[in-house]
């Protein structure tokens, strides 16, 4: 099989209610979908978070992929990486890596369908049949009260989640501590509770809030400082009274290497739609395991990203190695976004659904999901469709 056509769809959907975090406020959800068609008509789907990466994907990357064999994913990845590095510099970070991620995920889906096997088997086979997920929600909302916040948190417990994550960094330190304290009281001591600052603090502020939260059994403190500030992560790793997590915005194994080799995290969080797709994320995960750092992937997209992450996470070895393994302790977990997202909720006919905090790995070919192209086209903005069939 040869790759015949690459299409992209820029999707935007308004949401209600809107919500915020330390770096912004969301009133819409954005996504870039990638559809790759083989010369036999087989289709694979991918996605990336960087909507501005559409022009990079269409003009620079797609022509390099047309005419290639989708079974040669490593070769295609290196071909894209070399060209991205040449045009965009700095080891294909930024929009280049986002575009590569979308194409790469679609190639794995396409290849799996062509071979008649699920992506997890193409990645080496499952270590576990089910993957643990935690609820990501508890954002800042308009007219928020501790009562509404705690009602949301208790809802996640009742839905079977064994862990959840809330935001810090938008309010004063004392106000955020009060939010976290209210959540902990509402959910009890048996549920894992994580906090995410989205890079809101400097080292001293991160230490201040961490000390104030030390009595609330925080499972990890995510992105307290700028994602590229290695020295601050190294300091906080040794000083914080709770584990440190990060890495969701890093691109390719080359950016991850400097953090992993120095053991700057307790938990690393690559995002398959940002870091370089399944091809490079698998390398990143192996690197992390060798460094004794648990992988707990970041996910912030549609069922395409969820499916890709389920398949890859099912193949990851326990960290640390153990005969009897427990999610959160040895087995990886990844986040399941619970905020409003019409794109996630409408474009797939057979979405992955959690039961008691676990998602069962699909055994269907490729990613194991069916994309409803009619719904994709409904959400595609005017001028947001591109098609490339011309080889570089």
Predicted ranges, named:
Residues 124, 129-240:
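Metal-dependent enolase-superfamily TIM-barrel catalytic cores that perform enediolate-based chemistry
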Residues 363-392:
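Extended hydrophobic packing segments that form well-structured cores
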Residues 1-45, 49, 340-347:
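Structured beta-strand/loop patches that form or line metal/cofactor-binding pockets in enzymes
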Residues 3, 41, 61, 103, ...:
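Conserved, mostly hydrophobic/aromatic
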Residues 118, 132, 192, 243, ...:
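Proline-centered loop/turn at the N-terminus of a beta-strand
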Residues 36-114:
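Metal- or metallocofactor-binding catalytic centers and their adjacent structured scaffolds
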Residues 56, 211, 217, 228-245, ...:
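Shared catalytic-loop signature of beta/alpha-barrel
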Residues 48, 93, 135-137, 166-168, ...:
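A cross-domain feature marking catalytic cores of carbohydrate-active enzymes
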